[in-house]
């Protein structure tokens, strides 16, 4: 299975490189400017504030365990916002490119020996392919796809696609873990360490293969510290966006992004 995840990482790098190398002028990579960085920071901070506000307002709709986790996460609000605001002081040397902008496991079709990436941003009114409108695929998308914002106009940072896929892998793992415990609740302690190990290894396989395949392109920061900071911020942003969605629409499933957000912010205590 790790080989399959690594292949997905390589195909993601191929996607970004292909989008950057298009002969269409509108696909040319462009430097990520100081103004771009400031707009990014403002958006991330505003989105995080909104997620915390909604979580605070909807705690009563959560289960007792989820409400306790929510209270813990809310105590980290200030530290999370400080972390995101630091991006404005980060001198990012990277180029923006056309990206998928809605990238998760629900957008991946498995062929016999490879993957096909589908459902790029479409013009208004254009429907998805028929196969993706069938009941099976609609159900798959609901289960595997964390909600994302509409694709922004213009170009963005490729690491956003990487972050949303990493979050999707995490959400799929958490969903399978929960389904297992419903059937075998007595094995919670035994299985927890294996679930954590599985998530770490799948994420590492995807990210390592992606970075190796991309091979220092202009759409990734050459500085490893910058790359780590940006990716961590985007994964956290995606997780909080997912949390906001579930708190509003599916509070019974809010435990999935809540648990992930707690894990991502644990070092901030």
Predicted regions and their residues:
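Substrate-binding beta-hairpin/strand module that engages nucleic acids
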Residues: 170-201
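ATP-dependent phospho-/nucleotidyl transfer catalytic cores
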Residues: 1-100, 111-113, 124-155, 159, ...
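Conserved catalytic-loop position in the HRD/HxD motif
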Residues: 102, 107
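Conserved active-site beta-strand element of glycosyltransferases/polysaccharide synthases
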Residues: 117
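Alpha-helical D-x4-[hydrophobic]G micro-motif in the C-lobe of protein kinase domains
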Residues: 161-165
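Alpha-helix capping/termination and helix-coil
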Residues: 23, 91, 112, 166-180, ...
